[in-house]
Amino acid sequence: MDRSPGSQPPAAGIEQEVADLYEREAGGILRYAAALANSRETAHDALQEAFFRFFLCRSAGQRIRSPKSWLFRVARNYVLDQKKKSFRNEVGMESLSNVPCPAHRDEADGFELLQGLPQIGLSPREIECVRLRTEDLRYDEIAGVLGLQAGTVGALLARAHGKIRKAVGDGVHKKCDFAHPVARERRYAS
């Protein structure tokens, strides 16, 4: 994030920027936050908090290099903070249920696969990487969200892909390919 005090965009321009970004990214951020939180309410709060903070930063003249990954990271941090507060306050978590994937996704079986990731034996980090990758975040964006190196993200996704293929079979190979787009194009071109 850069601070450029003399380059504050007009308020109407910021509002349009936020509205356009919301239209493009809100669904993915909401799905990710819901899967992470296991709470629809917390996911909506995380989404609102992420876009509110984005608006405040932009209104203060700050430039955000990668708005998509920045928003995912803010939503993730919000959910994790809420989980910590909830745990400290000993709020009952048993009433929370999994949040279904919004209907705009055609791959219902892909969503079922995502719900089964813990049973396949994926680590929490691998699961987070897979969920973010299915929201079309690039390796560097996932790295920014999770505070990892892009190479680590690649290794986690490769390991997750191998575990998924082993558990589900090779038929899932093209449906759930987490490879970097260039590597994927090379592999399927041959």
Q: Which stretches of residues belong to each language-model region?
A:
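Acidic, proline/glycine-rich intrinsically disordered inter-domain spacer in sigma factors
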Residues: 9-16, 20, 94-120
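Arg/Lys-rich amphipathic alpha helix in sigma70-family domain 2
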Residues: 72-94, 106-109
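A short, charge-rich alpha-helical start-of-domain segment used by transcription regulators
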Residues: 2-31, 41-44
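Helix-turn-helix DNA-binding module
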Residues: 118, 124-125, 132-155, 162-166
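Structural recognition of an alpha-helix C-terminal capping motif at a helix-to-coil junction
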Residues: 31, 45-52, 56, 65-77
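Short alpha-helical "packing" element that flanks the helix-turn-helix/winged-helix DNA-binding module
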Residues: 113, 128-130
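DNA-recognition helix of helix-turn-helix
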Residues: 76, 80, 146-176, 189
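The N-cap/first-turn positions of alpha helices
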Residues: 26, 125-126
